Structure formats: structure tokens, C-alpha cells
Amino acid sequence: MSSFVPNKEQTRTVLIFCFHLKKTAAESHRMLVEAFGEQVPTVKKCERWFQRFKSGDFDVDDKEHGKPPKRYEDAELQALLDEDDAQTQKQLAEQLEVSQQAVSNRLREMGKIQKVGRWVPHELNERQMERRKNTCEILLSRYKRKSFLHRIVTGDEKWIFFVSPKRKKSYVDPGQPATSTARPNRFGKKTMLCVWWDQSGVIYYELLKRGETVNTARYQQQLINLNRALQRKRPEYQKRQHRVIFLHDNAPSHTARAVRDTLETLNWEVLPHAAYSPDLAPSDYHLFASMGHALAEQRFDSYESVKKWLDEWFAAKDDEFYWRGIHKLPERWEKCVASDGKYLE
């Protein structure tokens, strides 16, 4: 493979050639990768160009068609965040085919900031802060009457990249805590981890394969699979000694009516969780935070190697690790109440 990397116009000309050879966008992408390496456009970009070719538009130049309405741009960016709100500015810029500075400006205009590795509103409005505060007050009041942390089962999703380069420090304002952000290879393979756990450890997890997503139907089946794992690993629930208290976020696939019906059938109690609150979700502030550091500079060559690494990583964590993640909740609820619902640092 030579060191030559085609520019945008050259790459698009190659795609026209592939299009007329009746190649698919995916096949064309594989040919580009084989010839020029991983710096070529993503499959999604190739698919977008193929759609243009099918409509008869074979112009490979970036033309100004008039600036689209700002709300359209924001909707496009928001759609990417809805798909994966842990993406970096660079990843977002590459998908939108704009500069990283443009994404940074738009995120700022949309009022977004990264908290616990996820993009959330920079400035919560009064109603959002009040909801967070009220929710935490209710949970604290209940906890002080009688602890229920041992009954919490929580879970979430996280992208795992086959190649995760060295973590880079982020730049923050004076007085603000420094953070480190993994900058994975946008063009590399990745798999989505869906994991559920409690104070004693991991109960069940799945790795989604290429093209799979968490929609309502899949999430329903995941809950059924989780329930089966609970019956095997936590017999106290099968004996009805305890009722599951389920903590998950407000993603659309989690709040669909069909999912609510499934949770009701399972007789699980759903713990209140305010929107825009990754700082109050144990998977985000504890499990994934620790996992992210361990994943830095990891390289996987297959789906099976990712699974093997996860099995070993989960098993290497002692009971204290999982216990601590769940039992941090009251302290975080208190801090949220004390700050009138603002984000925790």
C-alpha cells in the first residue's frame, strides 16, 4: 500500500467508477480501505454519495447551495448525539463533513457540555434542575427511612472500539477539574456493550454485532434475558424475597410503552431518574469511567477478543468495586440537592 491518500474529490471520482461497475457502497468502501487505508470516508459517507449518484448528481465538488436553516443543522447534530452521546467533537465533525471548530461552535450554541463522558445541556433550565433536585430529595427521603440500595439493578450501553488510542488530556477553565477523553479511531470497528449489574457484580451483558442497535424490541428481549440471569445468579429474587428496583435512563428505547409493559409484567419497580443526569447513573460515573481507563490503548482483533477481555475485566473487580458504585448514590443525591439540581463536578 502506498502512502498516497486521495483527497475528497479524487475519492468521490473513484466512487463514481465503482457505482458504474454496479458495486455497492459497502463493497466500494472495502476497496478504498484496501487501497488507501483507514483514512478513507466511512461506509455511511459512501452510502450518501451513492444516493446522490442514483439521483443523477455526479458532481464531486462541494458546492454552496445556500446555508441551510440553523435548526436543520442542529437537528442533524442532535441526531448523531441521540445515536451515541459519548462521541468526541472530532468524530462528530467527520460525520458531518465540517470542521471540528464548527462542531464546537454549534455545540456551544446548542448549550451542550460533556459530563461523565456524555453530551448534555450546558445550562440546565429551571425546570430541569428542579426535576433533578426533587427526584433526589424523594430518593434521599426513602433511603433514610430504609435502605434499598441492595435491591437496585442498573444498566446502560457503551461503545467499545477495537482500537483505543492513548487518552489525551482535555483543556478546562482555571479551577475546573481536569479530565481525560478517549479519542477512538472513528473509522475502526466497534461493538456496543449493554451491561446490567448490582452491588454484587455483573448480572448480564450483551455485545451487539455490526449493524445491531438497541431498539424497543431488542431492549424488551434484553430485559427478559436479564430476568433469567437474575433468577440464576440472584436466587433471592426468584424466591420473591426481594423485588427488583430497576434504574435506567430515559432513552427512547427504554421508555417505550412496550418496554413499560414488559417491566410491569416482570413486576420490577422502576426507580425515578431525571432526564440529563448521567452524573446520577452508576454505570456512567463509576463502571464506565473505570472501564474507560482500562480500555485505553487496548487493541482487539475480533469480537471474541473483546468478549474475552470483558469477561476477565468484570471478574477481576472485587465485590467492593461494585458495592462502592451503587452506594455512592446517596452522596450524589445529597450533592445534587445541595446544589439545587446543578450538575455534579
Curated annotation (Swiss-Prot):
Residue segments, region Linker: 113-125
Phenotype for R48Q: Loss of DNA binding
Domain of life: Eukaryota
Binding site for Mg(2+) 1: D156, D249
Positions bearing the site annotation: Important for target DNA recognition and for strand transfer activity: R186
Subcellular location per the Swiss-Prot or TrEMBL entry: Nucleus
Name used for this protein in its record: Mariner Mos1 transposase
Gene that produces this protein: mariner\T
